[in-house]
């Protein structure tokens, strides 16, 4: 607050560099939300009318909306019942069908749900076979790793997106970032972030020598900029990122142990990955408890436990139903949704509070 800049100052590139360096990417483009980051990522990859983008139905709506913002069509690939991420098998089947009708997507957006990394090596191999680009939606996954590398390295994707919303692993109040190791994509995202404007002489169009042109709008962009105040907060959060994730894993390990005796399924951990552990989702064994998901959810709420549902399949939202999507489109995602409840997961969750959560779950599961 005592600096000369509230926005468009030195803290933004410093934060971008800190995140990119941590993740092992060459460039970071900070924006005002992960939604904006997904949008500029689609724009940078040339997504537009006539194109298709595929993503997971088990995600927040922004993972799909970014395609629509760009004028493209969106479709969904069902999830793996163990990881809750996009199923590689279903993706391969859908791609083969699309190839037969010349409708392979331009971009696929795998979502690292709850911080658990997708099988990016397999998805990348399919991208090489079928010719699509990849945007990793890692909104839940900063601080996680896949095959020993930080999520965000972009080894298996063109662009990776992080979220810094207040409920995420680190926060800037509101904010997001798109990472890439491609300088052309980075420059395009910088332009789309700020009205499609550039101040770089080498990118400007020729003008009469007696006219002063400090900047030019060379494309249609948005005002998606992050402020210096937000970036300063982000820099302070980055210092504690590994600590936050370590604490989340300790909380998850305690949950794993405490929930063993209850009729629920706890989150699976991939041996190839290290989750950012944004969420801890239990699946109810409904055939054993003889209670509905709503019964359990409402009981926990009544007991003061801050539970949530992640996620209603995107295509079940009324807006998407008006586009023609119907119930049953992704059976695994719908079965998961009917059984899933997210229980409290945050670094300040004490052992005592965790015990209270378990007691409340035990009570809620009983008829």
For each feature predicted by the language model, list its residue ranges.
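PLP-dependent aminotransferase class I/II
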Residues: 10-18, 25-26, 89, 93, ...
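Structural detector of well-ordered beta-strand residues that form the stable sheet scaffold
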Residues: 29, 54, 75, 134-135, ...
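PLP-dependent aminotransferase-like
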Residues: 43-129, 133-138, 145
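Conserved active-site segment immediately N-terminal to the catalytic lysine
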Residues: 136, 140-171, 187, 213-218
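Short, conserved catalytic or interaction motifs in soluble domains
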Residues: 33, 79, 166, 194, ...
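Phosphate-binding glycine-rich loop
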Residues: 5-52, 66-68, 76-78, 100, ...
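Active-site PLP attachment segment
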Residues: 155-199, 228
């Amino acid at each position: 607050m005592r600096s000369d800049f509230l926005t468009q100052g030195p803290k933004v590139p410093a934060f971008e560099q800190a995140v990119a360096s941590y993740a092992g990417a060459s460039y970071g483009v900070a924006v005002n939300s992960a939604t904006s980051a997904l949008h500029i990522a689609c724009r940078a990859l040339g997504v537009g009318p006539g194109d298709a983008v595929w993503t997971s139905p088990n995600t927040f709506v922004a993972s799909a909306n970014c395609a629509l913002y760009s004028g493209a069509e969106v479709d969904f690939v069902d999830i793996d019942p163990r990881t809750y991420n996009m199923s590689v098998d279903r993706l391969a089947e859908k791609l083969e069908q699309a190839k037969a009708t010349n409708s392979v997507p331009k971009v696929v957006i795998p979502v690292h749900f709850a911080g658990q990394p997708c099988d990016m090596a397999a998805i990348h191999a399919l991208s090489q076979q079928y010719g699509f680009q990849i945007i990793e939606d890692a909104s839940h996954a900063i601080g996680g790793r896949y095959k020993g590398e930080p999520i965000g390295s972009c080894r298996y994707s063109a662009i990776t997106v992080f979220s810094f919303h207040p409920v995420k692993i680190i926060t800037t109040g509101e904010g997001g970032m798109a990472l890439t190791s491609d300088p052309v994509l980075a420059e395009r995202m910088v332009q789309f972030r700020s009205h499609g404007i550039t101040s770089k002489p080498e990118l400007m169009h020729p003008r009469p020598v007696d006219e002063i042109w400090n900047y030019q709008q060379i494309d249609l962009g948005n005002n998606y900029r992050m402020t210096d105040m937000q970036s300063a907060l982000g820099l302070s959060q980055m210092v504690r990122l590994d600590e936050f994730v370590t604490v989340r894993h300790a909380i998850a390990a305690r949950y794993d142990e405490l929930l063993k005796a209850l009729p629920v399924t706890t989150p699976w951990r991939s041996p190839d990955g290290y989750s950012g552990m944004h969420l801890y989702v239990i699946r109810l064994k409904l055939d054993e408890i003889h209670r509905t998901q709503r019964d359990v959810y409402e009981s926990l709420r009544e007991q003061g436990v801050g539970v949530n549902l992640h996620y209603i399949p995107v295509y079940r939202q009324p807006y998407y139903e008006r586009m023609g999507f119907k119930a049953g489109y992704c059976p695994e995602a719908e079965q998961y949704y009917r059984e899933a409840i997210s229980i409290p997961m945050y670094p300040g969750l004490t052992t005592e509070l965790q015990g209270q959560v378990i007691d409340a779950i035990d009570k809620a599961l009983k008829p």
